[in-house]
Amino acid sequence: MGASVSSDITNTITCNLQEASNTILNNQNLNDHQGIFVNIIKIGDGNINANNFAEKSNASIDINALANALNNSSMNEDLNKKIAQTAKAAIKGVNLMQLGDANTTINDIVNTSIKVKNTAIQNLIIRFDQKIKINIYHIGKGNIKVKNVHLKEIHKIITKEVENAKNNNKDVTKLIEQFSQATESKVEGFSLKILSLIIFSTAFLGLGGVYVGGKIAFPVTLLLSILAFYQYFNWTDRTIFTDGFVDTMFNIDNDGCEALKNLTIENVKSAKGASDRCLKNPKCVAYNWNHNTKKITMFKGVLEEGCKNDILKNNTNETLFERKKLIVREGKKDPIMSTNGDLYLNNKNQTLWYNYKKKKQNNWKELKNEKKIILDNSIKQGIDKFIKIIFGYEEKLPGPMPHTLYIDYSHNNHLKVFLCKLNFLIGKDFKNRDQSKDWTLISTIHLDIKMLDFEENDSCGVIVEQNKLWLLCVAVILLFIGIIGMGLGLKKNKN
């Protein structure tokens, strides 16, 4: 797992730097030889539309200038956001619970990736004072439009610098060790303690040899065994396992969670602070943290395995790192300028609004063309309004859900609004319907959808009391020695 994380960090940074480099190059409108990054040699008149070229061109790309452009504040901020999302997505499918505190683990991966990226860019600026030559053939005058450039040489240089930066970063090494250890079962000091006990038993108590002090030593050994058993069941290491970006949270009404009782509700500013708060409270066995209210709900009592496993099963990592920050409001009036959010549903007249923000101000616009579609569909289904909005991805459209709008938010700059148009809800017509037409795309809303930040997500966690395995082994060995020794003593007394 450690090697996989190392590879993920390299791929995450390289791909995002490559994409940013391509964006910079592809946005250049170059006149003659005045391009900052690309100098293209041409002869004669006419425009060049260099579309999708890779090697059939005659140009030079200034690596140093490109690296400086990557390093400017706006580009760097955008890169950091993309790297953060890619880094999180890179470990989807990993059971974060086995890594302990997911809040810390995710932040460590993101921060380390950004550090490596910064080092790689600085190295590009310092080391490279060269231009990469490519060839393009053109005769005539005119402008040159560069589009969809993808150069293998740039990719090689970026990959090399990212690898160098990663290999010299101590935080990467720590992450690799952390992920590697998560898959190993490790008992500190186990071998030495068992070995010491065996040596003590055979040498001092005389097992297999001379019986020395058995009348006192072996009863004491049995008492020590009982003490070791007691310590094994009562002396535990208290650790917390957390998960972020969760849909399903702990609730005393959940199946299997009936043994939990509400302990306390407190204000906590961050997900990390919430997990620390529960860990420090000796009565806390599980917690939920709500990012909207900034409150932690702690639970006491017995945490059944069924309850814990059900929460873990429902909080899968398939899409949790890809979620967008989409705020939906509902009300019985149309939204006003001060209403914040991305989408607004007027439940009274069944209208859907979207907020195209300009200059950081709210600007609400109604999807007027869709109002009639929604109303007509609702009337046909015998209701006066649609009931709910759900969110997901277009390729994962659910089964028929009458009276529902489905919002696909998987795209970076727009939403797709689907309506479940079931006109036949009973009988043969429903069974024999064309299921591909259950959902109809009624609108595409162009919005700048922000990615979720880690602290803008709900999280939950459980306390795990881990027994010390070496104590159990000590108890068993002491019990064995005590019983055998007492038996030898009784036999000797009879003789």
Curated annotation (Swiss-Prot):
**What keywords appear on the UniProt entry?**
Coiled coil, Glycoprotein, Lipoprotein, Membrane, Myristate, Transmembrane, Transmembrane helix
**GO cellular component terms given for this protein:** membrane
Which residues carry a glycan?
N58, N71, N72, N103, N111, N262, N314, N317, N349, N457
Give coiled-coil spans as residue ranges. Answer: 150-182
Show the stretches that span the lipid bilayer: 194-214, 216-236, 469-489
* Residue numbers with lipid attached (N-myristoyl glycine): G2
List the subcellular locations: Membrane
Stated membrane topology is:
Multi-pass membrane protein
Q: Does the keyword DNA-binding apply?
A: no
> Which family is it part of?
Belongs to the IIV-6 118L/458R family.
The entry's protein name is Putative myristoylated membrane protein 458R
* Organism encoding this protein: Invertebrate iridescent virus 6 (IIV-6)
